[in-house]
A protein has these predicted regions:
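Short active-site oxyanion
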Residues: 29-35, 112-116, 168-169
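Class I SAM-dependent methyltransferase SAM-binding "motif I" and its flanking Rossmann-like core
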Residues: 103-161
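A contiguous loop/helix-start segment that scaffolds small-molecule binding in enzyme catalytic cores
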Residues: 3-7, 84-85, 163-235
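Short glycine-rich anion-binding loops that position phosphate/pyrophosphate groups of nucleotides
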Residues: 13-14, 91-95, 175-176
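Glycine/small-residue-rich loop that forms an oxyanion/phosphate-binding "nest" at active or ligand-binding sites
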Residues: 65, 72-115
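Glycine-rich, flexible N-terminal cofactor/catalytic loop recognition
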Residues: 1-64
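Conserved helicase motor
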Residues: 62-69, 144-148
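Alpha-helix capping/helix-boundary segments
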Residues: 41-43, 93-94, 123, 177
Length: 235
C-alpha cells in the first residue's frame, strides 16, 4: 500500500489576514480528510472563514499532544501510513517554523512519508523581507530572556555577533510585554543599531518600520501593546 502525503498548510497570521491564503491552498484543504493542528477549535474557526461551504463534519481533526511523545505523534500519522493524505496546520503562519508541527514533520521523514510544504504567510520571512536588514545571514531567536539582566546580557552577545558577521537577529515577545521589551532595547542598544518593528503583518493595521535607535528615540515607538510583533536588529 502506498503512503499518503503530509501537506504543510500555512494559516492566516490573525483576524483579517485571510486574504494571504492562496486559492491553491484552499483547493488542497477541500480534498483533505485528515487535519492535524495544535487546537482543532482554532482550525475549525479559520476554515469556516476560508471555506464557508466546507463540510467540516467529514474531516477528522487530530490535535498535537502537548508534551509530544513520539508514540503519540506516530498515532496521528497512522492515516498517512494507510494511504490517506493529511494537512498539518499551524495556529498562525507556517507549520514547522517556530512551531510545534516540526515534530510531526520530523517523524514523517522517519516513517518515509512524503512531506510537501505549501506556500503561505510566514511572519519571520515577511518581517525580514520588509526590514531592509541583512537577509544573507540571520538568526531567529524566539523569545529573549524576560528578566532585564539576562536580556541585557543576551543583547551584548547579539551585538558582538552583529559586529563580526553583520548578522540580523529576529525575536518575539509576549504581546503584552512588547513595550517593556522596546524600552530595554532603547536603553541598551547603540544609537547606530537599526531596529525594525514589524507588527500585525498581513493584517489591516500592519506596521513595519526600520530606524536607528537614535531615530526611534526622537520619534518614539508605535502603539503595539498586545499586538503580535517581530523585532529585528542589525546593521
Amino acid at each position: 500500500m502506498s503512503k499518503g502525503i503530509i501537506y504543510l498548510m500555512p494559516s492566516p497570521l490573525g483576524e483579517g489576514g485571510e486574504h494571504a491564503i492562496a486559492p491553491y491552498l484552499l483547493q488542497r484543504i477541500e480534498n483533505c480528510s485528515y487535519i492535524i493542528s495544535e487546537r482543532g477549535k482554532t482550525t475549525r474557526a479559520q476554515l469556516k472563514i476560508l471555506l464557508p461551504n466546507l463540510a467540516l463534519e467529514k474531516i477528522t481533526f487530530l490535535e498535537l499532544p502537548k508534551h509530544q511523545p513520539a508514540q503519540s505523534i506516530e498515532v496521528l500519522l497512522a492515516p498517512a501510513l494507510k494511504g490517506n493524505d493529511i494537512c498539518l496546520f499551524s495556529e498562525a503562519g507556517c507549520p514547522g517554523i517556530a512551531d510545534p508541527g516540526a515534530e510531526v514533520v520530523k517523524l514523517a521523514h522517519h516513517l518515509q512519508i512524503k512531506v510537501v510544504p505549501m506556500v503561505g504567510p510566514s511572519s519571520i520571512l515577511l518581517a525580514l523581507m520588509a526590514s531592509g536588514l541583512n537577509g544573507q545571514r540571520f538568526t531567529f531567536m524566539g523569545y529573549l530572556p524576560v528578566k532585564k539582566p539576562e536580556l541585557v546580557a543576551q543583547l551584548k552577545v547579539m551585538l558582538l555577533e552583529m559586529s563580526k558577521n553583520a548578522t540580523t537577529f529576529l525575536f518575539i515577545e509576549t504581546p503584552y510585554r512588547n513595550e517593556a521589551c522596546l524600552d530595554v532595547l532603547l536603553q541598551n542598544l547603540p544609537d547606530n543599531t537599526r531596529l525594525c518593528i514589524a507588527a500585525d503583518l498581513t493584517l489591516p493595521d500592519e506596521f513595519i518600520s526600520t530606524r536607528t535607535i537614535q531615530q526611534w528615540k526622537k520619534t518614539g515607538f508605535p502603539n503595539i501593546h498586545k499586538k503580535p510583533a517581530l523585532f529585528l536588529i542589525g546593521q
